[in-house]
């Protein structure tokens, strides 16, 4: 059997200067690719145009070059891959793993407030889907009418009910979580752009990424990403979530010792 070429990616958002933690993540990816005679890919995650900073991408490229981190492929830009996300979200909806949700932000805010008064947390999932405004509770004719009228909507992932989601991380080991505790995450926002979670999984599949090496702030997202791979019936890459770089300060040290 032919051994699969190692392919890793560094995927910063052009929202400002590249910080030390980002450079460290890039370095881990770069060194892992070189150790395994693989490819280091740069992907610019720029779907959030409101947060995009002019010149940030050039700054990222200069920083990587200054650090001696050579790019084998890229930079790829998510803003130039919208048709790919539309194709895959249509596939996911057709498979029954995602759905249109027409609830307004005001309506959801009211539901959250109502839950808070009861000492509860509002979670949009299998427990209340049928009572909310979405393509799972509406008739096909109602959904079509809403789409034709161009009513604002998002596309949500249909989190499976009563399922133990098992995940595997190279650093953290195996974990599991009850799907009933999870919400139906938004995959496509009201403006038509993909969320980080959806674009991330689609891009990693299309770019044939074998190892996802990223900061541990993304560890809570691993269950969702695992479910997305399962829904598409795609083989998931190996995951490694790196401990964060924390700033040492005298105040922090005093708090710790006290």
Where are these regions (language model features)?
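N-terminal Rossmann-like or analogous alpha/beta NTP/dinucleotide-binding catalytic cores
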Residues: 2-121, 191, 220-234
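Hydrophobic transmembrane-helix microenvironments that flank and shape a buried ionizable site
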Residues: 16, 181, 251-252
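Single, functionally critical "micro-switch" positions that shape active/binding sites
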Residues: 18, 95, 202-203, 253-254
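Short intrinsically disordered, low-complexity segments
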Residues: 30, 197, 256-257
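Active-site cores that bind ATP or allylic diphosphates and position pyrophosphate for catalysis
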Residues: 94, 100, 104-241, 246-247
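Single conserved hydrophobic/aromatic residue that forms the stacking wall/gate
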Residues: 248-258
